[in-house]
């Protein structure tokens, strides 16, 4: 049975980009879950936080238990969120407390502190790469592929999205990703949007049995999740990669960090 949809609220005292990226990176490890994301940025006062708490209460009345991912550092605002009928994930609090003990001083805990970093250029580059990855995720925005550093290609649920987001946030790499579908296999050639960008393509493959397990969690009993379909798609994708001369990385037992490291090494080799 497919699990019911869960609402994920991204709550921040600033833009929410940091909170959303971290939340998506964590939740990408649970592909069977059906999730709806709601962004609630600039929650910098108790009054605004109470409004978010009321929204959560309304969801709870319908039988849902929302998830809140937050980078709020103001204790009074945080208390309002923690009182709401939701599972709250404090993305900064535990780390700040540990650092306070380590350094022997209190954290500044000012609104948007992360965005006042000395290395503003690096931060802006990562946020730009993140915006690009989200805008060109899962085949979207293919007209922007000319601006990409790398385009990840593979069948559905091979690990393209979490790898793209990791490359963007950790390495400022503009990573797009494109899902291969049956129409592409029938053509026996690269999808038209990818043709002009062969040098940027990097294939991701996966063991069909592992793919079957992942898809079964998401859509049990469907043709999409059947082992036969998974074997067919992986086989056809690998043939396509071979014909096009695209470098390929197996994601079956690799972490996102390991996949990204291999792609970065390939990019450095040119």
UniProtKB/Swiss-Prot annotation:
Its EC number is 2.7.11.33, 2.7.4.28. InterPro entries: Kinase-pyrophosphorylase, PSRP. One of its GO terms (molecular function) is ADP binding. Keywords: Kinase, Nucleotide-binding, Serine/threonine-protein kinase, Transferase. It catalyses: [pyruvate, water dikinase] + ADP = [pyruvate, water dikinase]-phosphate + AMP + H(+); [pyruvate, water dikinase]-phosphate + phosphate + H(+) = [pyruvate, water dikinase] + diphosphate. Pfam families: Kinase-PPPase (PF03618). Signal peptide: none annotated. ADP binds at residues 154-161. It comes from the Bacteria. Belongs to the pyruvate, phosphate/water dikinase regulatory protein family. PSRP subfamily. Bifunctional serine/threonine kinase and phosphorylase involved in the regulation of the phosphoenolpyruvate synthase (PEPS) by catalyzing its phosphorylation/dephosphorylation. This is Putative phosphoenolpyruvate synthase regulatory protein. It comes from Deinococcus geothermalis (strain DSM 11300 / CIP 105573 / AG-3a).
């Amino acid at each position: 049975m497919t699990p019911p949809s869960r609402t994920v609220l991204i709550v921040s005292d600033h833009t929410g980009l940091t909170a959303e990226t971290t939340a998506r990176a964590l939740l990408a490890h649970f592909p069977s879950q059906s999730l709806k994301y709601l962004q609630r940025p600039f929650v910098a006062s108790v009054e605004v936080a109470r409004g978010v708490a009321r929204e959560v209460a309304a969801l709870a009345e319908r039988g849902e238990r929302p998830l809140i991912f937050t980078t709020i550092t103001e204790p009074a605002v945080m208390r309002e969120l923690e009182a709401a009928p939701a599972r709250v994930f404090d993305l900064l609090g535990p780390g700040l407390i540990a650092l306070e003990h380590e350094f022997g001083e209190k954290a500044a805990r000012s609104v948007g502190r992360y965005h006042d970093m000395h290395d503003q250029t690096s931060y802006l580059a990562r946020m730009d790469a993140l915006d690009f990855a989200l805008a060109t995720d899962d085949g979207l925005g293919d007209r922007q592929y000319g601006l990409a550093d790398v385009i990840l290609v593979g069948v559905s649920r091979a690990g393209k999205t979490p790898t793209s987001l990791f490359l963007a946030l950790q390495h400022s790499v503009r990573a797009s990703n494109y899902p291969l579908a049956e129409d592409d296999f029938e053509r026996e050639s690269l999808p038209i949007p990818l043709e002009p960008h062969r040098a940027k393509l990097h294939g991701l493959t996966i063991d069909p049995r592992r793919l079957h397990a992942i898809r079964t969690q998401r859509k049990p009993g469907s043709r999409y999740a059947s082992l036969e379909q998974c074997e067919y798609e992986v086989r056809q994708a690998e043939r396509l990669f071979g014909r096009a001369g695209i470098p390929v990385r197996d994601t079956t037992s690799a972490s996102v960090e390991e996949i990204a490291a291999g792609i970065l090494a390939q990019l450095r080799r040119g």
